[in-house]
Amino acid sequence: LFGQNATGGAINVISKMPSTSEFYTKASLTIGDYSLKKASTTTNFPISDTVATKFSISTIERDGFTENLVNGQDLDDASNISIRSDWVFNLSESSSLRVFGQFFDVDRNGAAMKGIDDFTSTNERKLSQDTLSKQQITSKVFAAIYESDLGYANLKILASTQEDDVLVDRDNDRHNYQDQIVQSIPQLPYIYTPPYYPMAEFRPETSLVETTTFEINLVSNEPALGGKLDWTVGAFFMEHEIENHIRGYVDNDQNGVIRYECSEAFADPSYCYEHDYGIPGRFDVYSVSYTHLRAHETS
């Protein structure tokens, strides 16, 4: 199933279909450094001469390769699980229906991104950041593929739906408060004296992506025009919805502590959002919405 459910484009990996011929189970276990534990198993069940199913599960647990020296958190770690159920129905000698569902879940500390002026350690796998990192991903895929040999051509119909839910907490300035002085970005507004990186974080940044696709293809079995023309006729439909939210915080009080709530009456934007950091109007929508909420709550 290409398109939405394929990774890459130049290289596509297609899983082996369930088989009605035999029962079999495969399993593997890998143990390595950084407390790596990787396990997977696949079992094929022939239900009848025309129906078969295959169930697969895999898990990976591994400590991170990188250490945050400020809070001791491991980064570049791994903690995920993948589950897949695959069914095939041989409707006739010339037609089949394949239905599968897949669930994938990630719950880890996240990827390491060292700040450009982070010189607290010469080891590239050691960094200093003052925000705890988190990454959570949940992906669900459901799809069906119908194939039929019509003699003169092969008919293929594909339908699928996919939902990806992503949540990330991260240190947005990539540095630890008052540890690193701005050297590499002279255009950065100096909020502190001396010019330290502003304490900033995303907590959280979320993305919900929902995609539905439908595809139909008719591919010739025999070339036309005396064997000179192979032809394909098809149509493709996709509906794609993305909902992103970013809750960003900056230490505007310059005291090394980020405030997660504005205590000023009616959340006056001139008090809570004094700086726009070079992007005029950056907080306009957020401040108006928050002002309305605070006014309603205190009335």
Where on the chain are the PLM-derived regions?
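Conserved small/polar residues in nucleotide/adenosyl-binding loops
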Residues: 291-298
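Outer-membrane beta-barrel translocator/receptor signature
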Residues: 1-68, 73-83, 95, 140, ...
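Surface-exposed loop/turn segments flanking beta-strands in extracellular/periplasmic regions
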Residues: 117-128, 176-191, 245-287
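Outer-membrane beta-barrel domain signature, strongest for Gram-negative TonB-dependent receptors
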Residues: 50, 72, 76-232, 238-241
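Short amphipathic alpha-helical segments, especially helix-boundary/capping motifs
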Residues: 13-20, 39, 58-63, 116-122, ...
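Extracytoplasmic loops and strand-loop junctions of Gram-negative outer membrane beta-barrel proteins
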Residues: 23-26, 66-71, 123-130, 195-202, ...
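Short, solvent-exposed loop/turn and secondary-structure capping segments
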Residues: 4, 66, 110, 244-246
